[in-house]
A protein has these predicted regions:
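Conserved catalytic or regulatory cores that recognize and/or transform ribose-phosphate-containing ligands
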Residues: 1-147
Length: 147
């Protein structure tokens, strides 16, 4: 079985690449998907539907267009990894974790110890909490093992 892993959350560090490189080095049977990680492109996803004067409606259109991708990829993944960084509030990541929890999709949270308290409910529904991308790779190695 090839596992599909959805990588959600923080876009300002290379955690995604670290996980991908780690799984490739081990030859794990996984493929990856993700939301659009280019911030400006994501913010402008709804611009093709017409110009908006109010920022709310531009954001609303872009959120809807982005949700086409996100919802489809989350529904089709086997497991999600949801990364919370310490610099920005990742509302999208929290939403993805909630979606996974509500739909019974297993997910791993990835974040530093300093933000355990604000994420206690998110972590409470997660199958695992990792502090490093290497720990995520170790979990993926274990769960994808054929023996």
């Amino acid at each position: 079985m090839i596992w599909t892993v959805y990588l959600s959350g923080e876009i300002h560090t290379d955690w995604r690449q670290q996980i991908i490189r780690g799984t490739e080095a081990l030859g794990l049977p996984v493929t990856f998907s993700s939301a659009v990680t280019h911030h400006e492109a994501s913010d402008a996803a709804g611009d093709m539907l017409g110009e908006e004067v109010a920022g709310f409606w531009r954001d609303h259109k872009s959120a809807k267009v982005n949700a086409i991708r996100t919802k489809s990829l989350l529904e089709n993944c086997d497991i999600a990894v949801v990364r919370f960084g310490d610099k920005y509030k990742q509302w999208n990541a929290a939403f993805d974790a909630g979606y996974c929890a509500a739909s019974g999709k297993p997910y791993i949270t990835l974040h530093d110890e300093q933000i355990i308290h604000p994420l206690k409910e998110v972590d409470g529904s997660a199958m695992a909490w990792a502090q490093t991308p290497d720990q995520v790779v170790e979990i993926l190695q274990y769960v994808t093992a054929s023996g």
